[in-house]
Amino acid sequence: RHEIGGCLATEESAAPGFRGNTHANIILPWYFAPIYRDFPEFWEYGVQLDQHICGSGAVFNKEQDYIAIYSEKHDPTQERSAKEIARWSEKDAEKWLKLWALWQSDEMQRVQVDMLFNPAEFRIAPEVLNRQMELYPKLVEAGFEPDAMVLAASHMKAARDSWESKALQYCVVRFALSGAYDVNEPGVGATTMGMAASLPTLCFVRGGTHQVAHAAHQILVQNGCKFFTHAEVDKAIIEDGTATGIKLSDGSEVRARKLVVSTLSPQQLCFDLIGREHLDYKLARRVEQLENKFCCLMWYSFALHEAPNYRAASMNPDINDTFWLGLAEDADPWHVAVECHYSRLGQWPPLEHYCPTVWTHSMVDPAYAPPGKHVAQNEQLAPPASAHSEKEWLEIKRRYAEELMGIWQKHAPNMDWGNIIGIDTNSPYDNLRMKNLAPNGSMALLDRTAYQVEGARPTPELANHRTPIKNLYATGAAWHLGANAGSTEAYNCYKIIATDQG
């Protein structure tokens, strides 16, 4: 079946009637802010966000304990979260409330919007930099001064510097990994605070993430757009350095009235759509060297008779209704760092360093599963698709299901094979069905290293969505902000087009 939306995908994959999001799951409140503003019907058309009781948390096998971060919906002041954090550190609980107050402030939100919904050249405007300076005293007051060490730090270092409790460090670092960051990579410490503050805000789309694609399609069709799902593009038509249309693989041509926009990977854009003959050596070389072997994931869906019932629920029943729940051997973020190390080597870590997260959307939205049943999903870092052959991946997918069930059952005794109705095994190798994710199956398209983010994503020459070809623009997950299901990349491209075209 050919569906629009790319990784905004939902399928009845584990068993008939059980919906699973095969790629994007986390939706943050700001993801579609410009769309809700400009097209209020977007919500009614299906992009309706909801939250679990707890936005994030983790259960720890050795300690037989847990940590829970309540969602904004169920804990708007974050007092309940602070109470849970205080079980591990009173100091962290106090600082958590300061962070939440800072995060809710107008000054912080203005800076956030500046950095999210502006292309690279707009983000260096004096008024943008002035708003950052105005925020600085509030950061210091809350205990998050972005000094030289923080700016140079990895997520691992910054989390350990900011929080006393290893349990809270684990939650923050594990979420950074879900943001496609290798938590050992330096130069990102200024964003670790945002990772922590986002934990109560984690949302999902009722009915499945593919609802986003349907809603966007409806708006676009109403505004005169047409879609062609069986028309592979071969090349951009370039005349005198200007894009004047596209040539399809069957030889037919489609002329452009004003411009052409690509959402391909940078490699597809430069070497397939444009052609190497139109690129200078420096840009071609940089695109050739882009890194995309990290954040390749195991994404499984499980059709269940019963929702997981965690041992930690005897201490707090709300842990059963947690969105991004880490299944950890113990409360030490070092496990996440080790898992990243092994992934960089193209290897699997020892089982004690596995750091899966799991969730059960059917506990909040019954549309995900038949009455009385549930669907659960997981995410875990894996080696890139290129690390193994097809035959090896088939065996790995079987083996990983056994390993994950063994870990899960330690924390939730009812998660045995008798509780499983069906299972969908989605791996980095399976991600290759999306051409733009080849050859490694990374969910983020590009690694989020310090030299492939913000004004350097994907390269400085392409970061502002312009290409070497006039009237040919580019966007997608390989552009800022990247590695999410939101609208930042598209909206920022629109701003550049509006600036250029008038």
Regions inferred by a protein language model and the residue ranges of each:
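A conserved FAD-binding loop/helix module that cradles the flavin
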Residues: 24, 475-499
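Active-site/ligand-binding neighborhood in enzyme catalytic cores
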Residues: 104-223, 230, 436-452
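A glycine-rich dinucleotide-binding beta-alpha-beta segment and adjacent secondary-structure elements
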Residues: 166-181, 348-359, 413-480
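Mid-domain catalytic core of redox enzymes
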Residues: 204-205, 234-369
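Active-site-proximal substrate-binding core of FAD-dependent oxidoreductases
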Residues: 232, 238, 499-502
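Conserved FAD/dinucleotide-binding core of flavoprotein oxidoreductases
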Residues: 267, 271-274, 303, 372-403
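Flavin-binding catalytic cores
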Residues: 307-308, 341-351, 392-432
